[in-house]
């Protein structure tokens, strides 16, 4: 079997992406099969550095309790839900939230 040699490029926690629409500061972006959080606002066609790992607070789907460690997804309204959709998981719940909660901490890309 051949040996493959890799050259270290970067830690991989930050990814720079092209903005195909205006991007808001801390906006959650789908980048291929992962999600990333914009580190700054940028205009359409600009480039923005995004966090591809870490724990972030996002709006949570109303009237849904989510337990710690549950795989979570983005629903059509832009809220975090435990109900799987057609998009990949955003990550896992990093906080336990009741149905009354309006936000949740999520460790992305886990």
Question: Which residues make up each language-model segment?
Answer:
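Surface-exposed, low-hydrophobicity beta-strand/loop segments enriched in small/polar/acidic residues
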Residues: 1-110
């Amino acid at each position: 079997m051949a040996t493959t040699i890799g050259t270290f490029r970067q830690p991989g926690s930050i990814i720079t992406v092209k903005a195909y629409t205006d991007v808001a500061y801390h906006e959650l972006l789908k980048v291929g099969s992962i999600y990333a959080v914009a580190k700054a606002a940028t205009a359409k066609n600009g480039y923005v550095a995004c966090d591809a790992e870490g724990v972030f607070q996002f709006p949570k789907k109303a009237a849904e309790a989510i337990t710690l460690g549950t795989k979570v997804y983005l629903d059509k309204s832009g809220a975090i839900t435990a109900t799987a959709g057609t998009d990949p998981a955003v990550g896992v719940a990093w906080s336990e939230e009741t149905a009354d909660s309006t936000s949740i901490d999520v460790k992305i890309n886990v």
